Amino acid sequence: MTVTGIIAEFNPFHNGHKYLLDYAEGIKIVAMSGNFVQRGEPAIVDKWIRAQMALENGADLVVELPFFTAVQSADYFASGAVDILSRLGIDSLTFGTEEVLDYQTIADVYSEKSEEMEAFVESLPSDLSYPQKTQKMWEKFAGVDFTGNTPNHILGLAYAKACAGKGITLNPIQRQGAGYHSLDKKVSFASATSLRLHKEDSDFVDKFMPNSKLFQTSPQVSWDNYFQLLVYQILTNPDLTSVFQVNEEIASRLKAAVREISSVEELVDKVATKRYTKARVRRILTYILVGAVDNSLPKSIHVLGFSQKGQFHLKSVKKSVDIVARIGRKPWDMLTQQADNVYQLGNPELCEQNFGRVPIRVK
């Protein structure tokens, strides 16, 4: 049977995600971000709620991306997620994209010319951001044309790069409805961004989310819930450069700006430059919030939930893969658990995120 991997955040889970799961074939394994997501912000509802949403709509197995995989630039995010999925035995990767390209050929190009391509990236001017450098790399070596703001398209290329040489078939599907950052409400499929913005509009949420009641009754958070704690962390840390990816320039810009702002977005706007993108700054703020220092990734894989098919698949791979089903009995990743403790501070109604929690089971 085909084993399909899906890399996701489900922030929150919506009809477009259900469409993706319906399209995927065989056993469907989701590698999902935990309580903090790739663009550098807390997930609107916790990882257990989002895993339940996925399992109730077609996923067979949901595993958690460790913090240092989930909150990273596209290449590291994709590489870490693909590594986890490949260890779980996937033979194909299904993902949504704004533009369906021949990602398989692109992966082959990278497999053949990776050293030359990475050397090209290193040769580009330092005032370019890393995303700008990788775009130039894909333009030169694979003839990819970049138009507009298409994060799923960029992630698709990162997936192709991560899957190169691994024997994984790439199955892109055209993104349905609104664009990734679209706020439009008059669409066939609303974006996660729009759903987060209009979360108080119950009719809108009901229309575009298959698990709308679960979403609406679950504790929710945003950056606003952590703003004061973030400011405290910046003001009281004597050496911000001890935090992952914080250099002297970023530390100086943060210290200068933090007393002049009243929201996280204002801080991002003041600190971001051409070289330091807003997404990168948000990730750095997330690292500061949770006190992240450089840390190795866990070798084991944390399971959030499974269907009967997913449970059978887990049994078939457990001899070759170290699986953690209950963190209280077996340690997993201390940084992710630390981040989860901080996440819980955002809403007093949030449940314990690790100790005593067992995988969600659906029939």
Curated annotation (Swiss-Prot):
Top-level enzyme category: ligase
Write the Enzyme Commission number(s) for this entry: 6.3.4.-
Q: Which GO terms describe its molecular function?
A: ATP binding; ligase activity, forming carbon-nitrogen bonds; tRNA binding
Which GO CC annotations does the UniProt entry carry?
A: cytoplasm
Protein origin, superkingdom: Bacteria
Instruction: Tell me the compartments it is located in.
Output: Cytoplasm
| Binding-site residues, ATP | 7-20, 96, 152, 175
Keyword line: ATP-binding, Cytoplasm, Ligase, Nucleotide-binding, RNA-binding, tRNA processing, tRNA-binding
From its record, what is one biological process in GO terms?
Answer: tRNA modification
Q: Which Gene3D superfamilies match?
A: HUPs
On whether Lipid biosynthesis is a keyword of this UniProt record, the answer is: no
> SUPFAM superfamilies in the record, alphabetically?
Nucleotidylyl transferase
Q: Which reaction does it catalyse?
A: cytidine(34) in elongator tRNA(Met) + acetate + ATP = N(4)-acetylcytidine(34) in elongator tRNA(Met) + AMP + diphosphate
**Sorted alphabetically, which InterPro entries does this protein's record hold?**
Rossmann-like_a/b/a_fold, tRNA(Met)_cyd_acetate_ligase
Give the family this protein belongs to, as stated in its UniProt record.
Belongs to the TmcAL family.
PANTHER family in the record, alphabetically? TRNA(MET) CYTIDINE ACETATE LIGASE
Main function: Catalyzes the formation of N(4)-acetylcytidine (ac(4)C) at the wobble position of elongator tRNA(Met), using acetate and ATP as substrates. First activates an acetate ion to form acetyladenylate (Ac-AMP) and then transfers the acetyl group to tRNA to form ac(4)C34.
What is the official name of this protein in its record?
Answer: tRNA(Met) cytidine acetate ligase
Name the source organism: Streptococcus thermophilus (strain CNRZ 1066)
Q: What is the lineage of its organism?
A: Bacteria, Bacillati, Bacillota, Bacilli, Lactobacillales
Q: Which gene encodes it?
A: tmcAL
